[in-house]
Amino acid sequence: MTRGRRLGMLCLVFRPILHGLFALGMAAFASGCSSGTETGNPPFQAELSYTAYSSAPQLVAVGDAGGQAVVDSAWLDLDTVALLGQGRCVEPEPAALSLPGLGIGDHASGQHNATRFAVSRAEYCALELTFVLAQPEQIQGGVPQDLQWHSVMLAGSLADGTPFTLLSAATPTVRLEADAGSFEISAKQAKTLIGFDLATWLADVDWASATRVGGAIDISAQQNAALLAQFESNLARGVALYRDADGDGKLDDVRVRLAHGE
Protein backbone atom coordinates (compact mmCIF):
# COMPACT_ATOMS: atom_id res chain seq x y z
CA MET A 1 0.00 0.00 0.00
CA THR A 2 1.21 3.49 -0.76
CA ARG A 3 -0.11 6.96 -0.13
CA GLY A 4 0.62 9.77 -2.57
CA ARG A 5 0.18 13.53 -2.81
CA ARG A 6 1.21 16.26 -5.22
CA LEU A 7 3.58 19.16 -4.54
CA GLY A 8 3.98 21.32 -7.64
CA MET A 9 4.94 18.89 -10.42
CA LEU A 10 6.42 16.42 -7.95
CA CYS A 11 4.54 13.25 -7.09
CA LEU A 12 5.40 12.32 -3.52
CA VAL A 13 4.76 8.73 -2.48
CA PHE A 14 5.01 7.87 1.19
CA ARG A 15 4.99 4.34 2.52
CA PRO A 16 3.06 4.19 5.84
CA ILE A 17 5.76 2.12 7.53
CA LEU A 18 8.22 4.97 7.08
CA HIS A 19 6.23 7.20 9.41
CA GLY A 20 6.72 4.66 12.19
CA LEU A 21 10.42 4.42 11.40
CA PHE A 22 10.62 8.20 11.38
CA ALA A 23 9.13 8.39 14.87
CA LEU A 24 11.51 5.72 16.12
CA GLY A 25 14.42 7.50 14.47
CA MET A 26 13.48 10.76 16.13
CA ALA A 27 13.34 9.05 19.52
CA ALA A 28 16.70 7.39 18.98
CA PHE A 29 18.17 10.66 17.81
CA ALA A 30 16.86 12.57 20.82
CA SER A 31 18.35 10.06 23.23
CA GLY A 32 21.61 9.27 21.48
CA CYS A 33 22.63 11.80 18.85
CA SER A 34 21.93 15.28 20.22
CA SER A 35 24.01 17.08 22.76
CA GLY A 36 22.97 19.25 25.67
CA THR A 37 19.67 19.30 27.50
CA GLU A 38 16.20 19.41 26.02
CA THR A 39 15.90 22.99 27.26
CA GLY A 40 19.24 23.90 25.72
CA ASN A 41 18.40 22.32 22.37
CA PRO A 42 14.71 22.93 21.67
CA PRO A 43 13.28 21.32 18.51
CA PHE A 44 12.82 23.36 15.35
CA GLN A 45 11.55 22.85 11.81
CA ALA A 46 14.23 21.82 9.32
CA GLU A 47 14.02 21.31 5.58
CA LEU A 48 15.84 19.01 3.15
CA SER A 49 15.39 19.94 -0.52
CA TYR A 50 16.39 18.11 -3.69
CA THR A 51 17.40 19.38 -7.12
CA ALA A 52 19.27 18.40 -10.28
CA TYR A 53 21.94 20.77 -11.57
CA SER A 54 25.07 20.79 -13.70
CA SER A 55 28.57 21.65 -12.55
CA ALA A 56 29.63 21.90 -16.21
CA PRO A 57 26.74 23.39 -18.22
CA GLN A 58 28.91 23.67 -21.31
CA LEU A 59 28.97 19.86 -21.36
CA VAL A 60 25.60 18.98 -19.81
CA ALA A 61 22.92 21.65 -19.45
CA VAL A 62 19.69 21.37 -17.48
CA GLY A 63 16.62 22.53 -19.37
CA ASP A 64 18.43 25.17 -21.45
CA ALA A 65 20.30 24.83 -24.73
CA GLY A 66 24.05 25.31 -24.78
CA GLY A 67 25.56 22.05 -23.65
CA GLN A 68 26.76 19.08 -25.65
CA ALA A 69 23.79 17.38 -24.02
CA VAL A 70 20.66 18.97 -22.56
CA VAL A 71 18.65 17.16 -19.88
CA ASP A 72 14.99 18.17 -19.93
CA SER A 73 13.75 15.79 -17.23
CA ALA A 74 15.40 13.83 -14.43
CA TRP A 75 12.92 11.45 -12.82
CA LEU A 76 14.14 9.72 -9.65
CA ASP A 77 12.44 7.45 -7.11
CA LEU A 78 13.98 8.18 -3.71
CA ASP A 79 13.36 6.30 -0.49
CA THR A 80 14.35 6.93 3.12
CA VAL A 81 17.10 9.41 4.05
CA ALA A 82 19.18 8.61 7.13
CA LEU A 83 21.23 11.23 8.99
CA LEU A 84 24.01 9.64 11.00
CA GLY A 85 24.89 11.36 14.26
CA GLN A 86 28.44 12.57 14.90
CA GLY A 87 30.60 9.77 16.25
CA ARG A 88 28.20 7.08 15.03
CA CYS A 89 29.83 6.48 11.66
CA VAL A 90 32.47 4.18 13.15
CA GLU A 91 29.90 1.88 14.75
CA PRO A 92 28.73 -1.26 12.90
CA GLU A 93 25.08 -0.16 13.13
CA PRO A 94 25.08 3.63 13.54
CA ALA A 95 22.07 5.31 15.09
CA ALA A 96 20.22 7.32 12.47
CA LEU A 97 17.56 9.97 12.18
CA SER A 98 15.31 8.60 9.41
CA LEU A 99 13.35 10.94 7.16
CA PRO A 100 10.42 9.69 5.05
CA GLY A 101 11.25 8.96 1.43
CA LEU A 102 10.55 11.77 -1.02
CA GLY A 103 9.18 9.37 -3.64
CA ILE A 104 9.01 9.98 -7.38
CA GLY A 105 9.79 13.37 -8.85
CA ASP A 106 11.27 15.22 -11.81
CA HIS A 107 14.25 17.04 -10.33
CA ALA A 108 14.99 19.01 -13.50
CA SER A 109 11.53 20.61 -13.52
CA GLY A 110 12.49 23.70 -11.51
CA GLN A 111 10.00 22.85 -8.77
CA HIS A 112 10.93 23.16 -5.09
CA ASN A 113 10.95 19.55 -3.87
CA ALA A 114 11.47 19.23 -0.13
CA THR A 115 10.92 17.19 3.03
CA ARG A 116 10.27 19.08 6.26
CA PHE A 117 10.97 17.58 9.66
CA ALA A 118 11.32 18.49 13.34
CA VAL A 119 14.75 18.09 14.90
CA SER A 120 16.97 19.42 17.67
CA ARG A 121 20.37 20.98 17.05
CA ALA A 122 22.94 18.29 16.35
CA GLU A 123 25.99 17.36 14.32
CA TYR A 124 26.11 14.56 11.78
CA CYS A 125 28.93 12.62 10.16
CA ALA A 126 27.09 11.31 7.09
CA LEU A 127 23.83 11.04 5.19
CA GLU A 128 22.48 7.98 3.38
CA LEU A 129 20.02 8.21 0.47
CA THR A 130 18.40 5.15 -1.12
CA PHE A 131 17.25 4.84 -4.73
CA VAL A 132 14.32 2.45 -5.29
CA LEU A 133 12.38 1.01 -8.23
CA ALA A 134 9.17 2.76 -9.24
CA GLN A 135 6.21 0.42 -8.74
CA PRO A 136 3.33 0.08 -11.24
CA GLU A 137 0.83 1.79 -8.91
CA GLN A 138 3.11 4.84 -8.73
CA ILE A 139 2.93 5.52 -12.48
CA GLN A 140 0.27 8.21 -12.40
CA GLY A 141 -0.18 11.97 -12.50
CA GLY A 142 2.32 12.69 -15.27
CA VAL A 143 4.95 10.15 -14.21
CA PRO A 144 6.31 8.58 -17.44
CA GLN A 145 5.33 4.95 -18.05
CA ASP A 146 8.93 4.03 -18.86
CA LEU A 147 9.97 4.79 -15.27
CA GLN A 148 8.16 1.65 -14.06
CA TRP A 149 10.64 -0.82 -12.49
CA HIS A 150 13.41 1.77 -12.77
CA SER A 151 14.93 4.20 -10.26
CA VAL A 152 16.30 6.80 -12.68
CA MET A 153 15.02 8.15 -15.99
CA LEU A 154 16.83 10.97 -17.78
CA ALA A 155 15.53 12.43 -21.04
CA GLY A 156 16.87 15.18 -23.27
CA SER A 157 18.76 15.80 -26.49
CA LEU A 158 22.27 16.24 -27.83
CA ALA A 159 23.53 19.43 -29.45
CA ASP A 160 22.76 17.98 -32.89
CA GLY A 161 19.14 17.45 -31.90
CA THR A 162 19.35 13.70 -31.30
CA PRO A 163 16.91 12.77 -28.52
CA PHE A 164 18.10 10.43 -25.78
CA THR A 165 16.58 8.52 -22.89
CA LEU A 166 18.47 6.81 -20.08
CA LEU A 167 16.83 4.22 -17.82
CA SER A 168 18.57 2.71 -14.79
CA ALA A 169 17.33 0.07 -12.37
CA ALA A 170 20.22 0.64 -9.95
CA THR A 171 19.08 0.72 -6.31
CA PRO A 172 22.11 1.86 -4.32
CA THR A 173 22.11 3.40 -0.89
CA VAL A 174 24.38 6.37 -1.55
CA ARG A 175 26.42 7.45 1.46
CA LEU A 176 27.46 11.11 1.65
CA GLU A 177 30.43 11.55 3.99
CA ALA A 178 30.84 14.89 5.75
CA ASP A 179 33.51 17.02 4.08
CA ALA A 180 34.89 18.31 7.39
CA GLY A 181 34.25 15.25 9.55
CA SER A 182 30.81 16.49 10.57
CA PHE A 183 28.17 19.09 9.73
CA GLU A 184 25.60 20.81 11.90
CA ILE A 185 21.88 21.36 11.51
CA SER A 186 20.68 24.15 13.80
CA ALA A 187 17.78 26.59 13.99
CA LYS A 188 19.94 29.19 12.23
CA GLN A 189 21.14 26.73 9.57
CA ALA A 190 18.10 24.50 9.23
CA LYS A 191 17.86 24.21 5.45
CA THR A 192 19.95 21.85 3.37
CA LEU A 193 19.85 20.58 -0.19
CA ILE A 194 20.74 17.32 -1.90
CA GLY A 195 22.10 18.11 -5.36
CA PHE A 196 22.26 15.64 -8.25
CA ASP A 197 25.05 16.72 -10.58
CA LEU A 198 24.00 15.66 -14.07
CA ALA A 199 27.38 16.66 -15.49
CA THR A 200 29.12 14.16 -13.20
CA TRP A 201 26.53 11.49 -13.94
CA LEU A 202 26.95 11.82 -17.71
CA ALA A 203 30.63 12.82 -17.85
CA ASP A 204 31.89 9.43 -19.06
CA VAL A 205 29.01 8.59 -21.42
CA ASP A 206 30.51 8.22 -24.91
CA TRP A 207 27.67 9.58 -27.01
CA ALA A 208 29.58 9.04 -30.26
CA SER A 209 29.66 5.28 -29.70
CA ALA A 210 25.94 5.02 -28.95
CA THR A 211 23.75 2.85 -31.15
CA ARG A 212 20.90 4.91 -32.59
CA VAL A 213 17.50 3.50 -33.47
CA GLY A 214 15.12 5.67 -35.46
CA GLY A 215 17.43 8.62 -34.94
CA ALA A 216 17.26 8.36 -31.13
CA ILE A 217 19.59 7.05 -28.42
CA ASP A 218 18.14 4.72 -25.81
CA ILE A 219 20.44 3.80 -22.92
CA SER A 220 19.21 0.90 -20.82
CA ALA A 221 20.03 -2.67 -19.81
CA GLN A 222 18.74 -3.78 -23.21
CA GLN A 223 20.43 -1.20 -25.42
CA ASN A 224 23.74 0.66 -25.10
CA ALA A 225 24.39 -1.23 -21.85
CA ALA A 226 28.04 -0.12 -21.79
CA LEU A 227 26.91 3.51 -21.67
CA LEU A 228 24.50 2.68 -18.85
CA ALA A 229 27.41 1.17 -16.91
CA GLN A 230 29.36 4.40 -17.40
CA PHE A 231 26.46 6.37 -15.94
CA GLU A 232 25.90 4.03 -12.98
CA SER A 233 29.59 4.07 -12.05
CA ASN A 234 29.27 7.84 -11.47
CA LEU A 235 25.91 7.78 -9.68
CA ALA A 236 27.17 8.10 -6.09
CA ARG A 237 29.91 10.57 -7.04
CA GLY A 238 27.30 12.92 -8.50
CA VAL A 239 25.32 13.32 -5.26
CA ALA A 240 26.21 15.87 -2.56
CA LEU A 241 24.66 17.77 0.36
CA TYR A 242 24.78 21.58 0.47
CA ARG A 243 23.56 24.44 2.62
CA ASP A 244 20.44 26.13 1.23
CA ALA A 245 20.83 29.52 2.90
CA ASP A 246 17.85 31.19 1.22
CA GLY A 247 15.67 28.07 1.32
CA ASP A 248 14.68 28.24 -2.35
CA GLY A 249 15.52 24.62 -3.17
CA LYS A 250 18.33 25.65 -5.54
CA LEU A 251 22.09 25.77 -5.16
CA ASP A 252 23.28 29.03 -3.63
CA ASP A 253 25.52 31.33 -5.67
CA VAL A 254 28.24 30.68 -3.09
CA ARG A 255 28.00 26.96 -2.57
CA VAL A 256 28.75 25.45 0.82
CA ARG A 257 29.12 21.70 0.43
CA LEU A 258 28.57 19.66 3.58
CA ALA A 259 28.92 16.06 2.42
CA HIS A 260 29.60 14.14 -0.78
CA GLY A 261 29.33 10.69 -2.33
CA GLU A 262 32.17 8.69 -3.80
Task: Identify what each model region corresponds to.
Residues 29-32:
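C-terminal motif of bacterial Sec signal peptides marking the signal peptidase cleavage site
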Residues 34-262:
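A short, solvent-exposed, low-complexity linear motif enriched for acidic/polar residues
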Residues 2-22:
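Bacterial N-terminal signal peptides that target proteins for export
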